[in-house]
Design a protein with these regions (language model features):
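Conserved catalytic core of two-component sensor histidine kinases
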Residues: 15, 42, 49
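N-terminal single-pass transmembrane signal-anchor helix
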Residues: 1-29
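Aliphatic-rich helix starts adjacent to a transmembrane/signal segment
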Residues: 28-45
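Compositionally biased non-globular segments, especially hydrophobic aliphatic-rich helices
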Residues: 10, 39, 119-120
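Periplasmic/extracellular, small/polar-rich flexible segments of pilin-like filament-forming proteins
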Residues: 50-125
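Conserved alpha-helical elements of the SDR catalytic core
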Residues: 25, 32, 52
Length: 125
């Protein structure tokens, strides 16, 4: 007997394998999106530090103002904040993103803002 085509078992096995491969690919894509949101928040916080340094060079102090009379600074679409707090010897700032529940922070000076623990290095949780 000469058969053409595939048996039901063969088709079922191929479908299961394809389902596994697709589920792995979707999970990796979701992780990549989360990492992208965190990277944009960290980049925005580094840019904030740069803007604060430029501002303090002219005015000899840091500021919480963004825009007219304050920092020349723009936030990436999707990022929220920054919330800037002046400290005795610098400032601390935090930022969120509308697509994730994680937040990132950075500080300059001696007053850390968790999750940041190293001065000038943004950290997220």
């Amino acid at each position: 007997m000469n058969r053409n085509g595939f048996t039901l078992i063969e088709l079922l096995i191929v479908s299961v394998i394809m389902g596994l491969v697709i589920s792995i690919a979707i999970q990796r894509f979701a992780n990549t999106k989360e990492k992208t949101y965190l990277m944009t928040m960290k980049a925005d916080l580094r840019n904030l530090v740069t803007a604060e340094v430029v501002y303090s060079t002219d005015s000899l102090r840091y500021t919480t103002l963004i825009g007219s009379g304050g920092l020349e600074y723009h936030v990436t679409t999707g990022n929220t904040g920054p919330a800037i707090a002046l400290t005795l010897d610098g400032f601390a700032a935090s930022m969120g993103n509308t697509n994730t529940s994680k937040t990132c922070s950075i500080f300059i000076g001696s007053t850390a803002l968790p999750p940041a623990t190293d001065e000038g290095v943004p950290a997220c949780r």
